[in-house]
Amino acid sequence: TISPKSGGYRPEYIGGQLERDRNFHNGPVWPWTIAAYAIAYLKVYQHSGESFIRRLLTGYEAEMSELCIGTLNELYDGNPPFKGHGGMSYAPSVASVIEVCNTLKKYETK
Protein backbone atom coordinates (compact mmCIF):
# COMPACT_ATOMS: atom_id res chain seq x y z
CA THR A 1 0.00 0.00 0.00
CA ILE A 2 3.09 2.22 -0.13
CA SER A 3 6.16 2.15 -2.35
CA PRO A 4 9.25 0.35 -1.01
CA LYS A 5 11.16 3.47 -2.05
CA SER A 6 9.18 5.59 0.42
CA GLY A 7 10.88 6.62 3.65
CA GLY A 8 7.83 5.45 5.59
CA TYR A 9 7.85 1.95 4.09
CA ARG A 10 7.37 -0.68 6.79
CA PRO A 11 6.98 -4.02 5.02
CA GLU A 12 6.45 -6.27 8.02
CA TYR A 13 3.30 -6.45 10.11
CA ILE A 14 5.07 -7.36 13.38
CA GLY A 15 5.61 -6.12 16.91
CA GLY A 16 3.27 -4.79 19.55
CA GLN A 17 -0.10 -3.23 18.84
CA LEU A 18 1.31 0.28 18.32
CA GLU A 19 3.97 -0.91 15.87
CA ARG A 20 1.47 -3.08 13.96
CA ASP A 21 -0.97 -0.15 13.77
CA ARG A 22 1.82 2.04 12.37
CA ASN A 23 2.76 -0.58 9.78
CA PHE A 24 -0.80 -1.54 8.81
CA HIS A 25 -1.03 0.61 5.64
CA ASN A 26 2.65 1.35 5.12
CA GLY A 27 3.96 -1.70 3.31
CA PRO A 28 1.96 -4.88 3.81
CA VAL A 29 0.14 -6.30 0.79
CA TRP A 30 -3.67 -6.49 0.85
CA PRO A 31 -4.92 -9.28 -1.46
CA TRP A 32 -8.42 -7.82 -1.72
CA THR A 33 -7.04 -5.00 -3.88
CA ILE A 34 -6.03 -7.41 -6.67
CA ALA A 35 -9.50 -7.51 -8.27
CA ALA A 36 -9.76 -3.79 -8.97
CA TYR A 37 -6.22 -3.71 -10.37
CA ALA A 38 -6.55 -6.87 -12.48
CA ILE A 39 -9.95 -6.00 -13.92
CA ALA A 40 -8.82 -2.48 -14.84
CA TYR A 41 -5.65 -3.91 -16.39
CA LEU A 42 -7.70 -6.35 -18.49
CA LYS A 43 -10.05 -3.58 -19.62
CA VAL A 44 -7.07 -1.61 -20.90
CA TYR A 45 -4.97 -4.44 -22.36
CA GLN A 46 -7.74 -7.00 -23.01
CA HIS A 47 -6.43 -10.34 -24.34
CA SER A 48 -2.82 -9.13 -24.39
CA GLY A 49 -3.02 -8.61 -20.61
CA GLU A 50 -4.20 -12.13 -19.76
CA SER A 51 -0.76 -13.71 -19.34
CA PHE A 52 0.38 -10.97 -16.95
CA ILE A 53 -2.72 -11.37 -14.76
CA ARG A 54 -2.36 -15.17 -14.77
CA ARG A 55 1.25 -14.80 -13.56
CA LEU A 56 0.04 -12.38 -10.90
CA LEU A 57 -2.44 -14.99 -9.65
CA THR A 58 0.20 -17.73 -9.38
CA GLY A 59 1.33 -16.63 -5.91
CA TYR A 60 -2.24 -16.46 -4.66
CA GLU A 61 -3.07 -19.93 -5.98
CA ALA A 62 0.00 -21.37 -4.27
CA GLU A 63 -0.92 -19.65 -0.99
CA MET A 64 -4.48 -20.98 -1.19
CA SER A 65 -3.17 -24.54 -1.46
CA GLU A 66 -1.06 -24.32 1.72
CA LEU A 67 -1.85 -24.00 5.44
CA CYS A 68 -5.54 -23.12 5.66
CA ILE A 69 -6.48 -24.67 2.31
CA GLY A 70 -8.75 -22.65 0.04
CA THR A 71 -8.31 -19.32 1.78
CA LEU A 72 -6.03 -16.30 2.14
CA ASN A 73 -4.91 -14.09 4.99
CA GLU A 74 -6.05 -10.51 5.44
CA LEU A 75 -2.61 -9.10 4.60
CA TYR A 76 0.96 -10.19 3.86
CA ASP A 77 4.40 -8.72 4.48
CA GLY A 78 5.49 -6.44 1.64
CA ASN A 79 8.83 -8.23 1.19
CA PRO A 80 9.62 -11.93 0.66
CA PRO A 81 8.78 -14.42 2.02
CA PHE A 82 5.40 -12.57 2.19
CA LYS A 83 4.31 -14.04 5.51
CA GLY A 84 0.55 -13.84 6.13
CA HIS A 85 -0.96 -11.81 8.98
CA GLY A 86 -4.31 -10.58 10.22
CA GLY A 87 -7.39 -12.70 9.67
CA MET A 88 -6.38 -16.22 8.67
CA SER A 89 -9.39 -16.78 6.45
CA TYR A 90 -10.29 -13.33 5.15
CA ALA A 91 -13.32 -13.46 2.84
CA PRO A 92 -12.57 -10.22 0.91
CA SER A 93 -9.13 -11.58 -0.03
CA VAL A 94 -10.57 -14.86 -1.28
CA ALA A 95 -13.49 -13.17 -3.07
CA SER A 96 -11.13 -10.82 -4.87
CA VAL A 97 -9.01 -13.65 -6.28
CA ILE A 98 -12.14 -15.58 -7.30
CA GLU A 99 -13.47 -12.47 -9.05
CA VAL A 100 -10.25 -12.19 -11.07
CA CYS A 101 -10.43 -15.89 -12.00
CA ASN A 102 -14.03 -15.47 -13.14
CA THR A 103 -13.10 -12.40 -15.18
CA LEU A 104 -10.30 -14.35 -16.88
CA LYS A 105 -12.80 -17.09 -17.81
CA LYS A 106 -14.86 -14.49 -19.69
CA TYR A 107 -11.80 -13.67 -21.78
CA GLU A 108 -11.28 -17.36 -22.60
CA THR A 109 -14.70 -17.60 -24.24
CA LYS A 110 -14.19 -14.55 -26.49
What are these regions (language model features)?
Residues 1-30, 59-110:
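Extended glycan-interaction surfaces of carbohydrate-active proteins
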